[in-house]
């Protein structure tokens, strides 16, 4: 019986100490291990509405600014490294971080954001978040079909 317990103890110690932890493997191989709960229904940021989908999008998408992870009230730089509010108190100028890149290495551009906001305002897309952009000049008019030229939207 002592031999059995000794062998079992050695087996347990060896099996627990060999190999790499998921964190070590992830760091070495650039893998993010994520416990998301349930499977996402999609990953299109303009369409999805569920919590599992947004957990993924928060991890892979960055806005012009980000919220302070320490709970502060100020916005922090995201893709935009800085921004200014013009005297009219309606127009923001964003200065993009030149190092901001997509996962394929392409540079993130202002046109990417313009395209994204214009797409979100396309009524046939069915985004449930379109009205969040209605504060932008002509956004609601474009969404309602009162104007047809997306370039008239103040993005």
What residues fall within each predicted segment?
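Sec-dependent signal peptide recognition
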Residues: 2-9
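C-terminal motif of bacterial Sec signal peptides marking the signal peptidase cleavage site
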Residues: 14-15
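Short, conserved catalytic or interaction motifs in soluble domains
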Residues: 18
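Immediate post-signal peptide segment of exported/extracytoplasmic ligand-binding proteins
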Residues: 23-33
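Envelope-exposed proteins and targeting segments
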Residues: 28-30, 60, 79, 88-92, ...
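N-terminal lobe/hinge region of extracytoplasmic solute-binding protein
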Residues: 35-87, 118
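Aromatic- and charge-enriched surface segment that lines or borders ligand/interaction sites
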Residues: 82-129
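Surface-exposed binding/hinge segments that line
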Residues: 112-114, 121, 125-155
């Amino acid at each position: 019986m002592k031999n059995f317990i000794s062998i079992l103890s050695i087996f347990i110690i060896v099996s627990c100490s060999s190999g790499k932890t998921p964190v070590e493997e992830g760091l070495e191989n650039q893998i993010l291990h994520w416990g998301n709960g349930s499977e996402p229904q999609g990953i299109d940021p303009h369409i999805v509405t569920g919590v599992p989908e947004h957990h993924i999008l928060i991890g892979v998408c960055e806005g012009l600014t980000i919220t302070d992870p320490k709970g502060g009230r100020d916005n922090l730089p995201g893709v935009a490294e800085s921004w200014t509010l013009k005297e009219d108190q309606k127009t923001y100028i964003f200065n993009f971080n030149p190092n901001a890149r997509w996962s394929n290495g392409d540079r993130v551009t202002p046109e990417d954001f313009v395209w994204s906001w214009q797409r979100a305002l396309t009524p046939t897309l069915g985004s449930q978040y379109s009205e969040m952009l209605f504060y932008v000049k002509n956004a609601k008019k474009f969404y309602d079909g009162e104007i047809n030229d997306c370039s008239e939207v103040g993005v």
